[in-house]
């Protein structure tokens, strides 16, 4: 039953992302969904409960299930649900997350240098010994950015980053498999180490902004014109 429930949940999330089920409209009944997926109504009910907990849908009067306006009123649970239920994280949404990181990564990098330049330098000094493979770089890059977020003194930054950990893991094949990506990443570490060693917080901010912009633009170039751009909230 567990696998069947996951199958139903995944299919419904895919349909919601594609706009098959419109916000404000009723979802198909349990009976109809059970027939569609070839499972029991109990299995459908369990999947719907998970979607409701994540914020995709709401059960209203007379047990009518209505699709929420999740892009306008959802929260990070929606991202977690998408991560769990997607083989490949939607490229358009991934680009939006990279745009978000472009906004806050330079700030936590600057704050981290201001608060603990020696601590940041100590982490960055380990970069030269990293194996030149995607898995090692992904792990180190994640730990570096999380550490800088913590050292920034802003308690929200680590919470936001940790909410994206599953997404980041899924994106690693796009961000670190090519040699040019790894070379750019190592260049970023060397420049950041120099900035941290000098205690130059503003330089670290600018270096990080340039690096995040490079990753964003390169990601968009890899996918070309992104398909299925998310609609702007009404």
Indicate residue ranges for each PLM-predicted region:
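Short, hydrophobic secondary-structure boundary micro-motifs
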Residues: 23-25, 121, 158-161, 204-205
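Short loop-to-helix capping motifs
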Residues: 29-30, 153-155, 199-200
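Solvent-exposed, non-membrane alpha-helical residues enriched in polar/charged side chains
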Residues: 13, 17-18, 149, 193, ...
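Short linear motifs at protein or domain termini
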Residues: 1-103, 226
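A broad structural signal for alpha-helix termini and local helix breaks/kinks
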Residues: 37, 152-153, 223
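Hydrophobic, amphipathic alpha-helical faces that serve as interaction scaffolds
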Residues: 84, 88, 100-116, 142-181, ...
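C-terminal all-alpha effector/ligand-binding and dimerization domain
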Residues: 128-129, 162-234
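All-alpha effector-binding/dimerization core of bacterial HTH-type transcriptional repressors
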Residues: 71-147, 187-207
């Amino acid at each position: 039953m567990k696998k069947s429930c996951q199958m139903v949940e995944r299919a419904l999330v895919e349909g919601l992302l594609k706009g098959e089920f419109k916000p404000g409209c009723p979802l198909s009944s349990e009976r109809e969904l059970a027939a569609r997926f070839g499972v029991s109504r109990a299995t459908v009910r369990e999947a719907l409960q998970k979607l409701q907990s994540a914020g995709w849908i709401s059960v209203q009067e007379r047990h009518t299930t209505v699709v929420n306006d999740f892009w306008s009123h959802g929260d990070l649970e929606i991202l977690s649900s998408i991560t769990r239920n997607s083989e490949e994280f939607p490229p358009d949404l991934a680009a939006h997350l990279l745009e978000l990181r472009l906004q806050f990564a330079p700030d936590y990098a600057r704050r981290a240098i201001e608060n603990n330049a020696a601590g940041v330098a100590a982490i960055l000094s380990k970069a030269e010994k990293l194996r030149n493979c995607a898995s090692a770089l992904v792990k180190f890059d994640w730990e570096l950015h999380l550490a800088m977020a913590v050292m920034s003194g802003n308690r929200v930054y680590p919470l936001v980053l940790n909410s994206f950990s599953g997404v980041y893991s899924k994106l690693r094949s796009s961000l670190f498999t090519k040699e040019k990506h790894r070379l750019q990443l190592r260049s970023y570490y060397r420049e950041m180490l120099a900035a941290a060693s000098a205690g130059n917080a503003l330089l670290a901010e600018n270096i990080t902004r340039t690096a995040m912009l490079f990753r964003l633009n390169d990601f968009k170039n890899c996918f070309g014109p992104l398909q299925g751009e998310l609609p702007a909230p009404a």
